[in-house]
Amino acid sequence: DSEIVSQIIYGEKFKIIKKINNWFKIRNSYDGYVGYIKKEQISDNFKPTHKVITLKSTIFKKNKNFKYIKTNKSLPFASKIMILNSDKKFSKFQKNQWLKNKDIVKENYIEKNLPKILKLFLNTKYKWGGKIFNGIDCSGLLQVFFQFNNIFIPRDTKDQIKFFKINEIKNNFQKNTLIFWKGHIAISINKQSLIHAYGPKKKVIIMNIKKTINEI
């Protein structure tokens, strides 16, 4: 039994290192993280055509009367899927599993508006190692934006600081400035405010930059 240090998102590729009973030890192809996944959570390899652009996209099933019925399952933001069939409102990505068309975009779509994406996660609870709608941490919040855009950045704050060559907290903040402390990272959304997954507040929250710097 161990703590969660990261999560793998639906549609991510990985390499299997070894099998242990009903589990596989894997290495995430995106950021190199090593972890474990249950056998039944592995799907056949596919070439993604689309990805989820909402915080949480509910999976629907089609009944005998051709009506779409909500299931209790969903895919998180940045999940990658291969569309098999579409109609006006829904697209099928697995056998009788459908997502709303408004929840997905083409796999090569680039979203340049960082605050727009991060605000999707507002009030999502803080969860160490989390990267999705049921909990996310500070470095996961930043990574998932770049991952959505098919751009690599490391998973952990200390490595993100090295990767972006951040040397010190600045006094002059513009939109999209990365602000870091030891073990914590936030992103400015304008000259006065930042957004971050903040442990003491237990959620993703927008706060005043100067007040936050003084508080941390």
Specify the residue positions occupied by each region the protein language model found.
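Active-site nucleophilic cysteine motif
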Residues: 118, 130-149, 153
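Short alpha-helix capping/helix-loop boundary micro-motifs
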Residues: 1-3, 61-71, 161-170
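Boundary regions of SH3-family modules and the immediately adjacent low-complexity/disordered segments
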Residues: 6, 10-21, 27-59, 64-71, ...
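Short, basic/aromatic beta-hairpin or loop at an interaction surface
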Residues: 1, 49-63, 144-161
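...with weaker cross-activation on analogous glycine-rich loops/strands in unrelated enzymes
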Residues: 151-210
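Short solvent-exposed strand/turn elements
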Residues: 28-32, 208-214
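Short, intrinsically disordered, charge-balanced linker/junction segments flanking boundaries
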Residues: 1-5, 213-216
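Hydrophobic beta-strand signal
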Residues: 15, 76-82, 180, 187, ...
